[in-house]
Amino acid sequence: MYEVQLDKFQGPLELLYQLVKKNKIEISEISLARITEQYLEYIEHYRDFNLEMASEFMVIASELIELKVKSLLPDSEEDSTEEEKGKTIVQRLKDYHVFKKVTELFREYEKAAGQIYSKPVNLDKYVDNEVNYEIDIDISELVEAFKKAMSSTDGVEVFEGDRNLKKIESEEIKIQDKMDQILELFNQNPDQGLTFSQLVSGNPSKMEIVVTFLSILELTKLRKIEIKQEKLFSDINLRSKAG
């Protein structure tokens, strides 16, 4: 398991997630930007891409992102009942079960093809058909925008016989560079805002979307920008707080 080195914690990423979930460590004290920077440096140094470790990192990082978003946005669940909270917890456990199944699927492809996995993948057989998945309106729509952007990206396609395959490309994108890029866009057009879809347009890689998303959260935490949404499922609007 990949380990992180932070001011408030040193150890496995999964242990950090468990401590945050149990409120042993405040999510506000954790820098997701630094965690991602360390992970990118790690895979750059060791070159040998480990798909199992990468899939585990993405699952846990996604959970930490959701917790971070909830800590930044106003609490909309003040009047929620214990029953509603219980349903939310149960839904989280069901979602985690699906994530684990997907992770097992990636492990199978890692053994069969190293850095190459087949496209498309039918995950229907890994989902319990008796479970009624509903839209959780208590989850930040910012997370939904992130998931939508992640699902719309394509990688570098290669061909092996009649199989259409996708090859995982390693790249290095720094959080600070992306933050500077976003702020520069605001400096060029100080009276205009930006949207999340604009920042991830042009067929970016999944890694770039993750870094962009974390950069937005970090800029929000630093009070450099503010994020708003006009209505449910609409685009995420960003506006500079300079001046």
UniProtKB/Swiss-Prot annotation:
The superkingdom of the source organism is Bacteria
Q: Name one GO biological process term.
A: DNA replication
Instruction: Tell me where it resides.
Output: Cytoplasm
Q: Name one Pfam family in it.
A: SMC_ScpA
Q: Which UniProt keywords apply?
A: Cell cycle, Cell division, Chromosome partition, Cytoplasm
Q: Which InterPro entries match?
A: ScpA, ScpA-like_C
Q: Cytoplasm among the record's keywords?
A: yes
| One GO cellular component term noted in the UniProt record for this chain | cytoplasm
* Keyword NAD included in the entry's annotation: no
On subunit structure and binding partners, the annotation says: Component of a cohesin-like complex composed of ScpA, ScpB and the Smc homodimer, in which ScpA and ScpB bind to the head domain of Smc. The presence of the three proteins is required for the association of the complex with DNA.
| Known function | Participates in chromosomal partition during cell division. May act via the formation of a condensin-like complex containing Smc and ScpB that pull DNA away from mid-cell into both cell halves.
Q: Which family does it belong to?
A: Belongs to the ScpA family.
- Could you tell me what this protein is called? Segregation and condensation protein A
Q: Which organism is it from?
A: Halothermothrix orenii (strain H 168 / OCM 544 / DSM 9562)
